[in-house]
A protein has these predicted regions:
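Peripheral, non-AAA+ core regions of ATP-driven protein-machinery
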Residues: 1-198
Length: 198
């Protein structure tokens, strides 16, 4: 497999636009390029991706790697495309199976160490993905609580690139306790807990 497509999403004001991240790996002068009406922070993600993969234990092959974002007429902003780019590249070089990314949306920022960081707009993105026929979403662990508000869609909240690879290769997923703790805490609070309320 030298080509792959991963579903993701972008916020356009208050609206959500589904975005498709394509990765093509071919012979030629080693190069990593990204195209498709990208903001500076999205263009910079190629360096985060390369370094994060290295620190996760995966060295990109010395080939021409092209990342394309569809549709081209939508301006891609923010760092939430880091994780789908990683997923697309890993699929294109054969680290994760293509079938695992079918009907799956991927959103998330990554650090240079390979950790996955939270992004804004997860709730509307997951809701729109469900409306478009997506059956599962891979999101940052810290976004799990809001993602789980959308029912009848599988949510995989990951803390690292390594965990995403594990899940996409059929590994066991253990739901984080983050959302449950937040929900429990919210139920326990009442007005007497707020200073000045009696």
């Amino acid at each position: 497999m030298s080509f792959s497509t991963v579903k993701s999403a972008a916020m356009e004001g208050l609206a959500v636009e589904m975005v498709y991240v394509e990765a093509d790996v071919s012979d030629g002068m080693p190069l990593f390029e990204m195209v498709g009406s990208l903001s500076p922070e999205v263009k910079e993600s190629k360096e985060r991706v390369r370094t994060a993969l290295k620190n996760t234990g995966y060295i990109l092959p010395p080939k021409r790697i092209t990342i394309n974002f569809i549709p081209a007429n939508i301006r891609k902003t923010g760092s939430g495309f880091d994780l789908p780019v990683v997923a697309a590249v890993l699929c294109a070089i054969g680290i994760v199976p293509e079938e695992a990314l079918k009907d799956t949306m991927v959103v998330g920022e990554i650090s240079l160490s390979g950790d996955v960081k939270p992004v804004n707009g997860i709730l509307p993105m997951v809701a729109e993905a469900k409306e478009r026929g997506v059956t599962r979403c891979i999101v940052p662990a810290e976004n799990q609580t809001e993602a789980l508000l959308v029912k009848e869609i599988e949510i995989f909240a990951v803390q690292s690139i390594a965990e995403m690879i594990h899940i996409l290769n059929g590994g066991t997923y253990i739901e984080k306790e983050i959302g449950k703790v937040v929900a429990k805490t919210a139920q326990m609070l009442d007005f007497s807990d707020i200073q000045g309320q009696y």
